[in-house]
Amino acid sequence: ADDELTLRTSTTWLQGIERELRRRLYQWRHLPVDMIMDDYIACPKVVHSTGLGISEDVDIRVTDQNSDIYSRQFHQQIACLQDVDKIKTPVVTYDREATEQARHVMAGIFGDILPVRVTGLKGKWFAPWDELIRWFGVEQAMTDLIDRPELVHSAMTRLMDAKLAELDQWQALGLLDRNDDNTRIGSGGYGYTTDLPGINLNPKQVRTENMW
């Protein structure tokens, strides 16, 4: 890429900002197609979650050292109905101070080049089955759908209840943001539409009904 994507910053946080900008500029120069550029730099709200209480136990096999895509073998962690209790309901917190610190630093970097805008959650990718197989293993999950459907249904119900509770917390804490804009929706479309945000919009308290 003729050094266009080479990072110059040193900290992980700044590298994340630089990487996004370099990729955006690279696409604009070489592959613009119907690309849209925002007229601001987004400073995401700093949000913490305790998570689901269970994470994948996995063996990996790397075939390309330059790629973050690799083969995985998941070890089963939900093998009986009692194991479903391992799935916990996340507790969400908003770190307002850390968000303001990040905004201040970014404003100092970009100055009058681009305004910095604090943004909330414009959407989170969530594929329930993709999450579940990390705890069952792909083959075991498919087998259990036939041999022990009550186990899979129980785990899926628990997972969905937990994620919906997390979504409710995002909304209650004012963390959601409109995504009827230059936001990737689903598998790749822009969020622009005249049907959103709808008539019941409070700009300071965006609700799920105002979003994709």
Which residues make up each language-model segment?
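Active-site loop segments of alpha/beta catalytic cores
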Residues: 1-4, 34-36, 47, 90-212
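N-terminal basic, low-complexity leaders that serve as flexible interaction/assembly modules and, when applicable
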Residues: 1-82, 101, 108-125, 165
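Generic intrinsically disordered, low-complexity segments enriched for polar/acidic and small residues
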Residues: 67, 71, 84, 187-189, ...
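Residues forming anionic-ligand binding surfaces in small-molecule and nucleic-acid pockets
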Residues: 76-85, 135-139
